[in-house]
Amino acid sequence: MLSHADLLDTRLGMKDAAAELLVHREALKCRLGGTDSGHPGDLTSATETVEGTTLLPGEEISNGGSNPNGMQQVNAKDQEKQQQQNSNQTGGQQNQQKQKRHRTRFTPAQLNELERSFAKTHYPDIFMREELALRIGLTESRVQVWFQNRRAKWKKRKKTTNVFRAPGTLLPTHGLPQFPSAAAAAMGDSLCSFHANDTRWAAAGMPGVSQLQIPPSLGRQQAMAQSLSQCSLGAGPPPNNMGLSGSLSSNGSGLQSHLYQPTFPGMVPASLSGPTNVTGSPQLCSSPDSDMWRGTSIASLRRKALEHTVSMSFT
């Protein structure tokens, strides 16, 4: 067993150790700026706090882990780093979105080669596009885009030229048949070319016209009908069944006269007798070329209307 002296020495050693710890604690508090004075009974808590402190790399003992200001500084630094990273990411995305595609500028030699290939075919395959791209120093995608734009321009130009060149696109046809150029020229030259001094339709060939007596009130209508019939007769020689004839009777007298007596060979005078009507042939100007337009001729329709009014006035 230990003697009494040994126990006293041990106790004095423990006191010295406690005093050293208190001094060390006071020194720490002075460095940290604390104002609280320690108590001799807080040796264990002081040792635990001193031993439990964790120091960051590069920090002094004054910036121990028990300092809340140091923790706030670390958190602030982390937040700043995160904000910088987020700002860099958003800035990169905005730059990618705002980045414009490069516009290719073709040289005259490249355009000449592309136009030559376009003249050969409007739809080149991938092999032809790759060969052309290697030849003129472009990428295959650029060549493909150029051909697409060139085809669109060609189609637009073709559509506009067809609109201005087509004869039937600007003016409506209204259902009228298209005439050949030669037939149209002949018809335009010969239509309404009959004159009063023409010897083909001399008065000698119409013996019954001089004996025809028409009331004065119908002189104007008869003149208009005669002018229309002369205009239609001037288009060509009438066939054998086209002699316009009528039988006019006043108060049942049965007066008959031949209006147009044909004088050409092979033509038979046609006369239709009726009680009180004037009948005209509905197929006036029915030459082989006029069969296409006789139903739509405005002149023939007007002539028929005038003949109808004349016949109604006689009745």
UniProtKB/Swiss-Prot annotation:
Residues 33-105 are annotated as: Disordered. SUPFAM superfamilies: Homeodomain-like. It comes from the Eukaryota. Its main location: nucleus. Residues 99-158 bind DNA. GO terms for biological process: forebrain neuron development; hypothalamus development; mammillary body development; neuron differentiation. Residues 72-97 have a biased composition (Low complexity). InterPro entries: HD (IPR001356), Homeobox_CS (IPR017970), Homeodomain-like_sf (IPR009057), HTH_motif (IPR000047), OAR_dom (IPR003654), OTP_Homeobox (IPR051895). A motif (OAR) lies at residues 296-309. One of its GO terms (cellular component) is nucleus. Belongs to the paired homeobox family. Bicoid subfamily. Involved in the specification of isotocin cells. Required for the specification of dopaminergic neurons in the developing hypothalamus and posterior tuberculum. This is Homeobox protein orthopedia B.
